[in-house]
From Swiss-Prot:
It is an enzyme of class 6 (ligase). This is Argininosuccinate synthase. The keyword Glycoprotein does not apply. Homotetramer. It comes from Azorhizobium caulinodans (strain ATCC 43989 / DSM 5975 / JCM 20966 / LMG 6465 / NBRC 14845 / NCIMB 13405 / ORS 571). It catalyses: L-citrulline + L-aspartate + ATP = 2-(N(omega)-L-arginino)succinate + AMP + diphosphate + H(+). Belongs to the argininosuccinate synthase family. Type 1 subfamily. L-aspartate binds at residues 123, 127-128.
Length: 408
């Protein structure tokens, strides 16, 4: 553990853990601390974080609070959704995709204020420590990283509270008892993990769900919306042009009201263990269905199938923290190229936990109704051509079968 750090930029939420980290950095490293708090759409007031940082001795000029919602959706969420990225077949990567942006902002601030270190509040068991630190090193190779949870001896809630009381860190009454589960949230999703959720055999209590109503409690009448796309990105809802963050927020409202986006899963962490989480991604679930809907009529079959083959690798890179890696950028270039004609409108029916595409249209549609119709007509497709096509594709199968017979 290096003690020659002069100034450190801390990813700061204003909560108990990062407030303890702030004071621990001051007392252990005896360095100047700069705080960065991001508004990612987590639904919390951020000014209390400023006041708490000031109370803990941070100079006003060393407190950075930034609304990054538009940048988050435009430059991180939307590029990821162009790929239809899903980790292990279920997880829409809501937590994973937020970490690179936070890391980027910390490095930008470090350069601005002349800091020689950055710090985060991720534990030594989870994925976030990897995501943050890979981002730091990719953007600033020589930066010093301080990960308090891997260094200190504050290994229990009791010790954290004792440290806070010793150093006069304000503790909200509801924080003195250990929370039944931990929550991480941003504009794309919220995740709940730990405590009451640790046994994967037990059903998650209803109070865990904070962003969606139960599908059973959703309206008995469907909500039908139309989402407009331009080059793979959603740009409008029901004909109203919206900014990326505003559009996602609107989809979140629609998804919440219809019980859409709940997910209870056990995933494989990058660090090697399995973890159980309850995720809510109402707007993202609708967006994914709609994007696949518009791609279904605008992407060539070969391009669509190749995208689906590449997607798991792309999703894994994001999950594991390699957003700034050459391979992710290479895949992104291919994915973005595929979206040149992914423009049009998709109609989606929202009903009791389901987002179902019921219509799609595009000026660049590859769907040819004349080719697929069962009615007679003068079209380029001749049924007789299928015979040769089938025979050629069956050639290797017939050859293999003949060999098997011969070997009997």
């Amino acid at each position: 553990m290096s003690r020659d750090v002069k100034k450190v930029v801390l990813a700061y939420s204003g909560g108990l853990d990062t407030s303890v980290i702030l004071k621990w950095l001051q007392t252990t490293y005896r360095c100047e601390v700069v705080t960065f708090t991001a508004d990612l759409g987590q639904g919390e007031e951020l000014e209390p974080a400023r006041k708490k940082a000031e109370l803990l001795g941070i100079k006003p000029e060393n407190i950075f609070i930034e609304d990054v919602r538009e940048e988050f959706v435009r430059d991180y969420v939307f590029p990821m959704f162009r790929a239809n990225a899903v980790y292990e077949g279920q997880y829409l990567l809501g937590t994973s995709i937020a970490r690179p942006l936070i890391a980027k902002k910390q490095i930008e601030i470090a350069r601005k204020v002349g800091a020689d270190a950055v710090s985060h509040g991720a534990t030594g068991k989870g994925n976030d420590q990897v995501r943050f630190e890979l981002g730091y090193y990719a953007l600033e190779p020589e930066i010093t990283v301080i990960a308090p949870w891997r260094e200190w001896d504050l290994t229990s809630r009791t010790k954290l509270l004792e440290f806070a009381e010793t150093h006069q860190i304000p503790i909200a009454k509801d924080k003195r008892g250990e929370a039944p589960f931990s929550v991480d949230a941003n504009l794309l999703h919220s995740s709940s993990e730990g405590k009451v959720l640790e046994d994967p055999a037990e059903d998650a209590p209803e109070y865990v769900y904070q962003r969606t109503i139960s599908p059973e409690a959703a309206p008995d009448v469907a909500t039908v919306i139309t989402i407009g796309f331009e080059k793979g990105d959603a740009v409008s809802i029901n004909g109203e042009a919206l900014s990326p963050a505003t559009l996602l927020a609107k989809l979140n409202e629609l998804g919440k009201a219809n019980g859409i986006g709940r997910l209870d899963l056990v995933e494989n962490r990058f660090v090697g263990m399995k973890s159980r989480g309850v995720y809510e991604t109402p707007g993202g679930t609708i967006l994914l269905a709609a994007h696949r809907g518009i791609e279904s009529i605008t992407l060539d079959r070969g391009a669509a199938h190749l995208k689906d083959e590449l997607m798991p690798r792309y999703a894994e890179l994001i999950y594991n923290g390699f957003w700034f890696s050459p391979e992710r950028e290479m895949l992104q270039a291919a994915i973005d190229h595929s979206q040149a004609y992914v423009t049009g409108e998709v109609t989606v029916k929202l009903y009791k936990g389901n987002a179902t595409v019921i219509g799609r249209k595009s000026p660049y549609s590859l769907y040819n109704q004349e080719l697929v119709t069962f009615e007679e007509g003068a079209v380029a497709y001749d049924h007789r051509d299928a015979a040769g096509f089938i025979k050629l594709n069956a050639l290797r199968l017939r050859t293999t079968a003949a060999r098997a017979r011969k070997a009997q």
